[in-house]
């Protein structure tokens, strides 16, 4: 009943927002900034430093949208949102786009009046435990108290996992990841569960990170990506192709350092990507230099990954399935033609 009521309210909010704000691109151009909904502080994805400067993989998508639409990656207002707040904020028009480690699911795509514009990080759910418990697998978690954030796919995946394996557990629920992690660190539960990338990030915030470990089990698929409102296909296209531009740039060997030189490339794909040939920007409602600015000011996907979450960052994440398709991964930009 609670879930049905939630979806009913969500649909109503979405319809109101769509009617009131039919052209997000025009609103953004008029105001001069992109209002981007992000996490309330997840290292590597969206986190502000002590000077208020935001960085992260999700932040880079926001910055890339601003570069494409407004000419500058700096023209972004970052709005931190909890798991519970994020969809309502987008539906109501409080933010223009949600780039907040959000999983693409059937219900979210169909019942909330929202559209997912793509995937900027492929992830999966796992578990973090204290090393001194001596656990090696999630199959040993029977009877465990598990800290989990409500209103997330994580909470539902957790229930599915224990039901499928006929094991008992005690969920300890919280409305924000920050409070859930704090409770786990204080010993109020045996386990904390989330996406593997989030576990790696939250582990760094614990009092003694080295006494905790992430179990190897992956119990779900978590395709994370940017989300926009239903009913504004031009904005959906622009956000989607912003992500594709970063992926295509990596595929074509174009990066922030060589993008000016690559304007001399003979490759038709590179020339279309950089606005030298064709008229791609017109169909998105922007000028033909949109993708050039993304690459010049933000970088290609590989640059963003390495800078924010890669092996040389505290998270030390490997590309894995987040490699390009030609390298054995899942990322596959649609053709620029």
Residue ranges and their predicted role:
Residues 30, 66-74, 91-95, 132, ...:
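Sec-exported extracytoplasmic/periplasmic mature domains
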Residues 276-337:
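C-terminal functional modules
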Residues 63, 67, 71, 75-140, ...:
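Acidic, polar ligand-binding/catalytic clefts
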Residues 60-63, 67-69, 131-135, 139, ...:
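Extended ligand-binding regions for polar small-molecule ligands
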Residues 1-8:
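Bacterial N-terminal signal peptides that target proteins for export
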Residues 18-22:
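Sec/Tat signal peptide C-region and signal peptidase I cleavage site
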Residues 35-44, 54-69, 123-175, 179:
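Bilobed "Venus flytrap"/periplasmic-binding protein-like clamshell domains
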Residues 24-99, 284-286, 298-301, 324, ...:
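Extracytoplasmic small-molecule ligand-binding "clamshell" domains
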């Amino acid at each position: 009943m609670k879930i049905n009521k939630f979806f009913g309210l969500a649909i109503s909010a979405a319809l109101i927002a769509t009617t009131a704000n039919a052209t997000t691109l025009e609103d953004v151009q008029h105001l001069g900034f992109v209002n981007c909904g992000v996490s309330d502080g997840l290292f590597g994805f969206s986190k502000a430093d002590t000077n208020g400067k935001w960085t992260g993989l999700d932040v880079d998508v926001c910055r890339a949208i601003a570069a494409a639409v407004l000419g500058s990656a700096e023209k972004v207002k970052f709005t931190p949102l909890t798991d519970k707040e994020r969809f309502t904020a987008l539906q109501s028009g409080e933010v223009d786009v949600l780039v907040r480690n959000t999983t693409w699911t059937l219900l979210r795509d169909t019942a909330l009046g929202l559209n997912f514009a793509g995937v900027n990080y492929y992830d999966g759910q796992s578990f973090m435990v204290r090393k001194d418990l001596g656990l090696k697998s999630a199959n040993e978690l029977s009877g465990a108290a598990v800290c989990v954030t409500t209103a997330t796919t994580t909470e539902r995946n957790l229930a599915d996992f224990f039901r499928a394996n006929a094991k008992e557990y005690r969920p300890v629920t919280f409305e924000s990841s920050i409070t859930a992690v704090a409770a786990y660190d204080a010993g109020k539960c045996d386990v904390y569960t989330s996406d593997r990338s989030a576990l790696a990030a939250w582990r760094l915030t614990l009092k003694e990170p080295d006494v905790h470990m992430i179990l190897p089990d992956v119990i779900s698929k978590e395709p994370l990506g940017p989300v926009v409102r239903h009913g504004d296909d031009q904005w959906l296209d622009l956000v989607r192709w912003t992500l594709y531009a970063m992926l295509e740039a990596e595929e074509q060997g174009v990066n922030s350092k060589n993008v000016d030189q690559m304007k001399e490339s003979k490759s038709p794909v590179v020339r279309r990507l950089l606005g030298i040939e064709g008229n791609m920007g017109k169909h998105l409602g922007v000028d033909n230099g949109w993708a050039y600015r993304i690459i010049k000011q933000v970088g290609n996907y590989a640059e963003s990954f390495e800078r924010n979450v890669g092996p040389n960052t505290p998270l030390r994440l490997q590309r894995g399935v987040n490699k390009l398709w030609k390298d054995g991964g899942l990322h596959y930009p649609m053709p620029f033609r």
